[in-house]
């Protein structure tokens, strides 16, 4: 069972359309689906809403702490509502997947993602679900061979190219049904469906 879906990103209009905010995009989509309005919740350090999705109540959260401090928001809401780490899905951008790809997994390392590192540190475990939304990598972008750390930072803080955005939007749509399966406790089917989707 999933009780909390967290979208990672950075607050503010200047970051809204950037690759790093892919997690926010999916949570916004889920809020619309569930007829919920994300509101500022100071005690949870972000925008939060309780939505009716897949015939159950699910909390949605967009931390307003900036990406690298996302753990504070996640742990604040999870502790308040007694939500266990394995009842949490964190939705985030993933450079190691091509734009338009999506993968679901439970546990594992942060893979260099500072938002995940902070969440793991605050929860005291890596045993939570991650929905990885592919945004591509600067080394695969035009003229991107040999991309260094600075290129990576610039890449995630820029909007995707039009064809990438279309692929990412299609992936967001494909994630909805598998998330519903996961929320109802059918993790195996959720992963099988998402990982074979085209």
UniProtKB/Swiss-Prot annotation:
One BP term from GO: protein quality control for misfolded or incompletely synthesized proteins
Stored Gene3D superfamilies: Peptidyl-tRNA hydrolase
MF terms (GO), sorted A to Z: peptidyl-tRNA hydrolase activity; tRNA binding
Organism domain of life: Bacteria
Catalytic function, reaction form: an N-acyl-L-alpha-aminoacyl-tRNA + H2O = an N-acyl-L-amino acid + a tRNA + H(+)
List of residues binding tRNA: 15, 66, 68, 114
Active-site residue list: 20 (proton acceptor)
Protein keywords: Cytoplasm, Hydrolase, RNA-binding, tRNA-binding
An annotated GO cellular component: cytoplasm
Entry EC no(s): 3.1.1.29
Localization of this protein: Cytoplasm
Annotated site location: Stabilizes the basic form of H active site to accept a proton: 93
Site annotation Discriminates between blocked and unblocked aminoacyl-tRNA: residues: 10
Principal cellular location given in the protein's record: cytoplasm
Enzyme class: hydrolase
Subunit record text: Monomer.
Function field: Hydrolyzes ribosome-free peptidyl-tRNAs (with 1 or more amino acids incorporated), which drop off the ribosome during protein synthesis, or as a result of ribosome stalling. Catalyzes the release of premature peptidyl moieties from peptidyl-tRNA molecules trapped in stalled 50S ribosomal subunits, and thus maintains levels of free tRNAs and 50S ribosomes.
Family per record: Belongs to the PTH family.
Protein name as it appears in the record: Peptidyl-tRNA hydrolase
Source organism of the structure: Cupriavidus taiwanensis (strain DSM 17343 / BCRC 17206 / CCUG 44338 / CIP 107171 / LMG 19424 / R1)
Taxonomy of the source species: Bacteria, Pseudomonadati, Pseudomonadota, Betaproteobacteria, Burkholderiales
Protein's gene: pth
